[in-house]
Amino acid sequence: MYHIKTIEGQLDSKGLKIAFVAGRFNDIIVDRLVGGAVDYLARHGCEKENMTLIKVPGAFEIPVVTKKLAESGKYDGIVVLGAVIRGATPHFDYVCNECAKGVAQVSLDNDLPIGFGLLTCDTIDQAVERAGSKAGNKGVEAASAMLETVRVMQQI
């Protein structure tokens, strides 16, 4: 349509080494995100022996562990997964903002695609909907975004 060279990422994860960083807080939700992401990448060719899951206490710990993984040079991409549900205090805002900023900075500093699957919901029902119910599985979406970005970057 535009008559120019276009680079797009193919959704083929064969041969890639992928790490997942998942918060244990709200694990009933997060486990569904992890399951969706792992299944998605396996269906797109990633061998299970090339996938590593690292569990951390919660969303606030995700950036530092993601940084360590990125700096190791062992992984082609990382998927971060967690669920933060709003409470009565501003704690929610601080945790969500710092996690997002930290993960984005790790991605930029290391030229490494990171799929961001941190649910930030007002209610547990919203989280359930986004973890494989009415609103799909945001773990799958994070894995897909990471995979496509890995393949785009390999062509640049």
Curated annotation (Swiss-Prot):
Disulphides: none
GO cellular component annotations of the record: cytosol; riboflavin synthase complex
Binding site for (2S)-2-hydroxy-3-oxobutyl phosphate: A88, T89, R130
Enzyme class: transferase
Reaction it catalyzes: (2S)-2-hydroxy-3-oxobutyl phosphate + 5-amino-6-(D-ribitylamino)uracil = 6,7-dimethyl-8-(1-D-ribityl)lumazine + phosphate + 2 H2O + H(+)
Coiled coil location: none
Positions that bind 5-amino-6-(D-ribitylamino)uracil: F25, A59, F60, E61, A83, V84, I85, F116
Pfam (any one): DMRL_synthase
GO molecular function: 6,7-dimethyl-8-ribityllumazine synthase activity
Active-site positions on this chain: H91 (proton donor)
A Gene Ontology BP annotation from the UniProt entry: riboflavin biosynthetic process
Record family assignment: Belongs to the DMRL synthase family.
Function recorded in the entry: Catalyzes the formation of 6,7-dimethyl-8-ribityllumazine by condensation of 5-amino-6-(D-ribitylamino)uracil with 3,4-dihydroxy-2-butanone 4-phosphate. This is the penultimate step in the biosynthesis of riboflavin.
NCBIfam families: lumazine-synth, PRK00061.1-4
HAMAP family tied to this protein: Lumazine_synth (MF_00178)
Identification of the protein by name: 6,7-dimethyl-8-ribityllumazine synthase
Native source species: Maridesulfovibrio salexigens (strain ATCC 14822 / DSM 2638 / NCIMB 8403 / VKM B-1763) (Desulfovibrio salexigens)
Taxonomic lineage: Bacteria, Pseudomonadati, Thermodesulfobacteriota, Desulfovibrionia, Desulfovibrionales
